[in-house]
């Protein structure tokens, strides 16, 4: 009986292809949009990811995200270092600056000031150069994508000179940093050098990054810092998630992408449900013949679900392959770094595809169960 079900399914190739494309389109749209969404919001906490040595971030109590910063007083660093449970604490500077590109154009960029002594705050992956050269006057490191955008068409090299806020900056290292949400150009320099580039006032320390001592958890040390200093202290994962939550709650990105995903699901249900119903309707006489020769309703239900399962499996595979190829191809572009297809998104889209197929099968099932075997002998 199941071989008969397959022959019925593959006999009408046009409807089979239409059913497969309906599931594939829905799967592709869900995976592509959710993959982009996760890649976008992940960029919100990129600065935290680039400081893997620290597991605690300390900031002004009013800070809500990584982009709206209220500077701390220099004396706060000593207070944090004196809190029991803190192994070390160093300053971190973050600010937006204007850079003049190689062709004379102005670009907005991100400037990160790392600790002068330890250089904590610099991304761990150095593509070119020596990080010790950052201790030279006017020395900066630049992200790989930032170099390509500032010096378009030039091979990656050291020694290039840029103007940050009309001050001289010499590239001594190329680093691989995490893609940022607001800027694709990121410069790194010593904390003291960063203050010279910006000169934003007396208090310029954006954050204090710290490491917990002993066997104490970052959450426990953070609570201790907050209790003793009055500053806001959070573990690195918590602060990164807070930055992501800010983007989710204060931008239109979730609504925009969520609408597209919902439309993809609704279109999938409508197209697959309608076409599968038409497929069953056109094969109603075949089901009537099977019923006339004694095939049970349970066996007929199994045949319909087998047909639906084959359509769902093929359609989901095609859609998932298309989404994977999209991210593989688009990921080669420097501006699309950090976007990927998480396994849980693929698994979730599989569940959605299965739900679409089950709904389509249930919608068509009534015709099969109540078909009159006598129609075989009519007209």
Protein language model regions, located:
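The feature marks short, hydrophobic/small-residue-biased sequence motifs that occur predominantly
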Residues: 74-83, 87-136, 165, 188-191
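C-terminal membrane-exit region of the final transmembrane helix in multipass inner-membrane proteins
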Residues: 342-379
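Basic-flanked hydrophobic alpha-helices used for secretion and membrane insertion
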Residues: 121-124, 130, 142-237
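Hydrophobic alpha-helical transmembrane segments
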Residues: 16-20, 321, 343-351
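Transmembrane alpha-helical interface segments in multi-pass membrane proteins
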Residues: 264, 276, 286-331, 348, ...
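Alpha-helical transmembrane segments
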Residues: 28-56, 277
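N-terminal Sec/SRP start-transfer signal
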Residues: 1-30, 41, 305
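Peri-transmembrane interface segments
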Residues: 36, 44, 221-270, 277-284, ...
């Amino acid at each position: 009986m199941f071989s008969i079900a397959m022959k019925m399914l593959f006999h009408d190739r046009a409807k089979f292809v239409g059913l497969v494309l309906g599931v594939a389109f829905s799967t592709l749209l869900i995976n592509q949009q959710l993959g982009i969404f996760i890649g976008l919001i992940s960029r919100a906490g990129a600065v935290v990811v680039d400081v893997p040595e620290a597991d605690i971030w300390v900031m002004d109590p009013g800070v809500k995200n990584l982009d709206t910063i209220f500077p701390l007083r220099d004396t706060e660093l000593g207070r944090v270092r004196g809190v029991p449970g803190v192994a070390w604490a160093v300053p971190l500077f973050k600010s937006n600056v204007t850079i003049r590109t190689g062709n004379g154009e102005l670009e907005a960029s991100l400037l990160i000031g790392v600790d002068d002594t330890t250089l904590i705050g610099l991304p761990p992956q150095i593509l070119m150069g020596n990080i010790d050269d950052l201790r030279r006057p006017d020395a900066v490191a630049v992200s790989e994508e930032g170099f390509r955008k500032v010096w378009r068409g030039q091979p990656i090299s050291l020694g290039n000179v840029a103007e940050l806020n009309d001050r001289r900056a010499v590239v001594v290292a190329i680093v691989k940093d995490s893609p940022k949400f607001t800027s694709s150009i990121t410069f790194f320099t010593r904390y003291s050098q960063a203050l010279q580039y910006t000169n934003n006032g007396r208090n310029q320390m954006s954050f204090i990054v710290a490491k917990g001592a002993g066997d104490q958890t970052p959450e426990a040390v953070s609570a201790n810092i907050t209790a003793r200093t009055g500053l806001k202290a959070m573990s690195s994962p918590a602060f990164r998630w807070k930055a992501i939550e800010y983007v989710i709650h204060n931008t239109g990105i979730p609504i925009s992408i969520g609408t597209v995903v919902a439309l993809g699901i609704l279109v999938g249900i409508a197209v697959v449900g309608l076409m599968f119903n038409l497929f069953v309707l056109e094969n109603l006489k075949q089901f009537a013949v099977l019923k006339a020769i004694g095939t049970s309703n349970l066996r007929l239900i199994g045949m319909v679900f087998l047909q639906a399962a084959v359509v769902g499996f093929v359609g989901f595979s095609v859609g998932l392959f298309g989404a994977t190829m999209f991210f593989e191809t688009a990921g080669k572009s420097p501006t699309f770094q950090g976007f990927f297809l998480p396994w849980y998104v693929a698994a979730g889209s599989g569940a959605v595809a299965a739900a679409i197929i089950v709904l389509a099968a249930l919608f068509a099932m009534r015709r099969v169960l109540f078909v009159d075997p006598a129609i075989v002998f009519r007209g």
